[in-house]
């Protein structure tokens, strides 16, 4: 006998599935040739999403378009994450470079948060664009977010400013309260990226996958001297270690791998070589979801494979010095002015932080604490001190290990110490 009517719950589920759509946002939060790795991995992510079947009109791409014409770029108009010393390499820009929705002039906290929050009128006001690309998603849709930049405990860099953990949580909460998505995956590449999501409420239905925990640095990969494509040296780090591994995995297993498998295998691979703890936060029940919940259902084309063993890994805080040293080595010139200036700037910042530590902890305790991390400390205090070092003293991100160690030691008490920043 034919059933007169389909089960209402089953019918609702099928209709919801039919109406559901997938959207993605890719943000590079920085500019400059030293940050080539953020440009290249963001571009690779865009290419992978397109290959997986996400239509271009369902992807928002904000990144530094000036990287293509950067004077130091040996391959203008191209972007590579992987070296290929004697071959043509894998150029990601062949797909991404014609699809910038927002460029370097738009990389500001206000615009990023407005785009993420789907506030079209605010984006219009801030950008001057008549028809800016802003999504208007529904409670049936899924959203994938990728953000790559420098970070610190409690936030990430965005252009010449910062986006705080609180601001990101507020944007996600606003979307959730407006029923603008069913599920969200947020991938964050930044030093101390775990600090942005370590208190993320599970009820927001967001799965956060970060390159590091709340206190550790992220690492760059394929840095000089392993920075060559077809005989030309890039003179910078080509990509980020965490990104290369998870992108390799989803490129080869995009139709079968789950969020949890992607996390665990990336975590384990990175942990074999570095003290960089890839982490996960938020709604961890989403670990069993296939990656195709957020990316397309088509297999991503497998191309050049990342070697099983990484090449020339450099902590993100040390990239400028590493790059300057190799520029001096390769040039053969006696002029070491660029390297000298960087070494002086780093020494100045170290002295200022050591003076701060000595004034609060005393010289002997500061000297003991500067080479090892304090595991128990007040994170709100640390965030305040890090922000003051940037705002009052002009220190730059990412902070080197010694700065982080001294700040953590200072913040081992309950209260934020009184500091004269003059």
Language-model-detected regions and their locations in the chain:
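Cysteine endopeptidase catalytic domains of the caspase/legumain-like
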Residues: 18-422
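Short, Lys/Arg-enriched N-terminal segments with co-localized hydrophobic residues
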Residues: 1-5
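Cleavable N-terminal signal peptides of Sec/SRP-targeted secreted and luminal proteins
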Residues: 7-20
